[in-house]
A protein has these predicted regions:
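Residue-level marker for well-ordered alpha-helical positions
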Residues: 6-7, 44, 70-73
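Conserved AMP-binding/adenylate-forming
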Residues: 49-85, 89-90
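ATP phosphate-binding P-loop of adenylate-forming
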Residues: 21-23, 150-151
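A short N-terminal helical cap/helix-turn-helix that marks the beginning
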Residues: 2-22
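Conserved AMP-binding/adenylate-forming core of the ANL superfamily
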Residues: 22-56, 77
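A generic secondary-structure signal
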Residues: 11, 49-53, 111
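Structural core segment of the AMP-binding/adenylate-forming
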Residues: 8, 77, 81-151
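Cytosolic catalytic domains that perform sulfur/thiol-centered chemistry
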Residues: 7-11, 34, 57
Length: 151
């Protein structure tokens, strides 16, 4: 892939795959680290999900309503891998897909962040291991479940 950030990550995977590249510490002090290999794997699966399930491609726009969490890194990198533009806090009606955290999704659906538009809303997990969301707002899809089945 020609993305310079992806190339840097691939280089890191070749040189030091187990070293952390993303460290997230939640409000309770729980620490989650993603190694270069884990970040690359998660981003590749998420990119495949975006491309194959939501038909995201170069020129697509993704509204990102994800809290400061390790998932934000994964889904931003995944969008860039597809050639899409990431719009942090983007207006849902001006984007092809909305990626939201579980606490942000209801606001997206209610119009808190602007007109809702016709695109899907995928909800990312904020579980330390990225497990599927136990409950989703009506009309949302679970990003963890969609990405997990990707090659």
């Amino acid at each position: 892939m020609s993305n310079p950030i992806w190339q840097a990550l691939e280089d890191r995977v070749r040189r030091r795959p187990a070293d952390p590249v993303v460290t997230y510490i939640d409000a309770d002090g729980q620490r989650t680290e993603l190694s270069a290999k884990t970040l690359a794997n998660n981003a590749a699966k998420a990119a495949n999900a975006l491309r194959d399930e939501a038909f995201v491609e170069a020129g697509s726009r993704l509204a990102l309503h994800v809290p400061w969490h390790w998932q934000r890194s994964v889904w931003t990198l995944a969008a860039w891998l597809t050639g899409a533009t990431v719009v942090p806090g983007g207006l849902p009606d001006q984007c092809d897909l909305v990626i939201a955290g579980p606490t942000e999704a209801p606001g997206v659906l209610s119009g808190q962040f602007g007109p809702t538009g016709q695109g899907e809303v995928w909800v990312v997990s904020v579980h330390p291991f990225g497990l599927p969301n136990p409950s989703l707002p009506e009309g949302c899809l679970d990003a963890a479940t969609i990405a997990r089945i990707q090659p």
